[in-house]
A protein has these predicted regions:
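Charged interaction scaffolds used for protein-protein
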Residues: 1-13, 20, 32-57, 61, ...
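Covalent nucleotidyltransferase core used to form phosphodiester bonds in nucleic acids
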Residues: 24-30
Length: 179
């Protein structure tokens, strides 16, 4: 399930898409964890007051990368690099766009959680032994655990054990190559 939102940037309506694929696409493109980066940006921007924020150049680049991935996910015709995409704008304010992207991401995560609750086969409490058992059942190595989030591992386990997922499309190599 995904959510699309249009945000006005520099007088243009830009579509942004949040879905379960975003963390993977972001990690593949930038070798970073989008959850950590969004939390970091949210802390840095504070209450949206430009004068009292803790934004540095690295934070700005993280924001631009997140915005780019979500825009590219919504519109495949967007250029293949964040730099080319950003060239389309005269101004691109983190203080106007980031809060809306965080809200969009929050709506998507909330929708995913509600959908997963409906698909969950068990109401067992997630404990460390249960989590490790699931990792073993999925055949994950310690190196895999370093790269994957707990949520992604739980998603992988749910999908491997549940036939109720009805996907309209199956991703192919071309889909991954676009990102």
């Amino acid at each position: 399930m995904s959510i699309v939102k249009k945000i006005e940037i520099d007088g243009k309506e830009v579509a942004f898409k949040a879905s379960a694929a975003i963390p993977r696409i972001y990690r593949l493109k930038f070798q970073r964890d989008i959850y950590k980066d969004l939390r970091s940006l949210e802390k840095s921007i504070g209450d949206g007051d430009e004068e009292n924020s803790n934004l540095d150049l690295f934070s700005l680049e993280m924001f631009e990368n997140i915005a780019y991935i979500m825009a590219k996910h919504a519109d495949g015709s967007i250029p293949d690099t964040p730099e080319e995409w950003l060239d389309d704008f005269n101004t691109f304010s983190i203080y106007q766009v980031l809060p809306q992207l965080i809200e969009l991401w929050g709506l998507n995560v909330q929708t995913d959680v509600e959908a997963k609750k409906k698909l969950r086969n068990t109401e067992r409490e997630m404990t460390t032994p249960l989590f490790l058992l699931r990792c073993v059942q999925l055949g994950l190595s310690m190196a895999d655990l370093e790269l994957l989030s707990i949520g992604l591992i739980n998603d992988m386990y749910s999908e491997s054990r549940n036939d109720d997922y009805n996907y309209a499309e199956i991703a192919n190599q071309d889909d991954y190559d676009r990102f």
